[in-house]
Amino acid sequence: VIGLGSSFLTDAIGATLNWRISPYVTLGTWGGYTKSNAVIGASGTVETTNWMVYLNFPDLFKQGNLGGIYIGQPPKITSSNLSIGNVPSFLNSAGFASEVAGAQPASTTHVELFYVHRLTDRISITPGLIFLFNPLQTSTSDTVTIGTIRTTFSF
């Protein structure tokens, strides 16, 4: 059984592109791939992919502020031959295991909107919204909506 004490040897590759279309718009993307081989506590391999596309709007409404729209896929198991399926035992025991052997049956889509509002040169507040469609990589899961607010102090 794969648990929190299991060890994996992982090879990972990723790429990022960022294009400043104008002083007020940047377009970017990133993607990644991992292949993990179980070495202690289990046997088998797991492959995952992830990606994101985004638009940033520097100086939106005021110099120093930033708006952002991000759309992507969190890490998704695309292939697995682990003996217990495609998720660790702590997720299996919680009832989140995939019913499809070898890969997760659907893709989670992450949509994020945020706005960095600079209050002073050293303090900013960032409200945001995150939507997770098909969470846990299953099409039967309800959409999750998360509201966020972050305060940043710069020294």
Predicted regions located by residue number:
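Short acidic-hydrophobic sequence patches enriched in Asp/Glu that either
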Residues: 9, 47, 143, 147
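Extracellular beta-solenoid/beta-roll
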Residues: 8-11, 23
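Extracellular/periplasmic helix-loop-helix junctions in multi-pass membrane proteins
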Residues: 136, 140-142
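Outer-membrane beta-barrel "beta-signal"
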Residues: 53-55, 143-155
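Outer membrane beta-barrel transmembrane domains
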Residues: 1-7, 14-18, 28-132, 136
